A protein has these predicted regions:
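Chitinase-like catalytic core of GlcNAc-active glycosidases
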Residues: 24-271, 286-307, 320, 333-342
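Short, solvent-exposed mixed-charge patches
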Residues: 345-346
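Residues that scaffold, gate, or flank divalent-cation-dependent active/transport sites
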Residues: 327
Length: 346
């Protein structure tokens, strides 16, 4: 042991000389970078999976991929939703390698690298399996206090609200339920502690939005007061309503099958015109809409072929803010046909 230590002491000056002789070949990646703010142009927004969807057999051969993979911007994606943090029953948010099976998160430096290459990166909250208990204020407060340090450390540019359970309406759109109040508490609590250009998007399923044209209460239309608040006060960057995994609705309670151009247009026009529920109008103009579609067959019910996606987009002639898709990894597993089709049409 003593000999090894002596030898290392002799080698240290030599190593220092070698390292100092070629500084141009050694560079440390920055692990902090500024919040980017809302993209001024069109967006193609995709979910980045922090787990391995090839290893678990969902969408081989393209599983986990680095968030800074140059293929992502090459195929048109300029907004990335990093999915999903683990949320413990008490509201504690976790974002770290191994927080769930086969999960690996991007480092702060890798986040900065992706952002330098053009990406705006949001943390997506919720999803089908990462629920937040919205019935308790203490849980909401714990959520805020634990997510804000993560958002700052990892250089996120915003949050995406993708909560798919636990949010219900009171039956009176002018009276918030406990779960609606606590979701607003979470959003306000996060935004208050982040830079003023920190972003907010939402990706509700159709029942939570245009489903309110059928009836308001329970899950039906339960996102509407939240959407209205942040659309009206200017903090909502845009809405990514999921045009899949269920029927779609127009302003008059009319119903359309997912995966149809007719349904795409009916929902989009309804929000642009303004959905009136119990005398309250909720309006999301075209330039604050980036509807969500499955990237590939199997990614979600209501898949639209590239031809149908093109028809839906071309109908609006560039009026929409963009499109969202589930997911980047799914698209990569089938030759990036979604991104390649959309990027030239926005």
């Amino acid at each position: 042991m003593t000999r090894l230590l002596d030898a290392s002491l002799v080698l240290l000056p030599m190593l220092s000389t070698l390292v100092g002789a070629a500084p141009a070949t050694v560079s440390a990646r920055a692990d902090t970078c500024a919040t980017k703010g809302k993209p001024s142009g069109k967006v193609l927004q995709g979910y980045w999976e922090n787990w391995d969807g090839a290893k678990n057999g969902v969408h081989p051969p393209f599983g986990w991929t680095p968030i800074q993979n140059p293929a992502i911007p090459q195929h048109g994606y300029n907004v990335i939703n990093a999915a999903f943090p683990v949320i413990l029953p008490d509201g504690t948010v976790k974002w770290e390698d191994g927080m769930d099976r086969d999960v690996k998160v991007a480092t702060p430096a890798e986040m900065c690298e992706a952002k330098a290459a053009g990406a705006t990166i949001l943390m997506s909250i919720g999803g089908a399996t990462a629920a937040v208990d919205l019935s308790q204020t203490a849980v909401a407060d714990k959520f805020i206090s634990t997510i804000v340090p993560i958002l700052k450390k990892y250089n996120f540019d915003g949050i995406d609200i993708d909560i798919e359970s636990g949010l219900t309406g009171s039956g009176n759109i002018n009276q918030l339920s406990t779960s609606q109040s606590n979701l607003i508490r979470i959003i306000d609590g996060v935004l208050a502690q982040m830079p003023s250009n920190f972003g907010l998007t939402m990706a509700p399923e159709t029942a939570y939005v245009t489903g309110g044209s059928v009836v308001y209460g329970s899950i039906w239309g339960s996102y509407l007061p939240i959407i209205k608040k942040y659309a009206d006060n200017g903090r909502l960057w845009w809405l990514n309503m999921q045009y899949y995994n269920g029927d779609m609705y127009g302003c008059s309670g009319d119903s359309y099958k997912a995966g149809t151009v007719e349904g795409f247009i009916a929902q989009t026009d309804c929000l642009n015109k303004g959905l009136v529920v119990q005398g309250t109008t909720i309006r999301v103009p075209y330039d604050k809409q980036a509807p969500g579609l499955p990237a590939q067959q199997g990614a979600g019910g209501g898949y639209m072929s590239p031809s149908l996606v093109g028809q839906a987009l071309d109908h609006y002639g560039g009026k929409l803010k963009g499109l969202m898709t589930w997911s980047i990894n799914w698209d990569g597993s089938k030759g990036w046909t979604f991104g390649d089709n959309v990027k030239g049409r926005l």
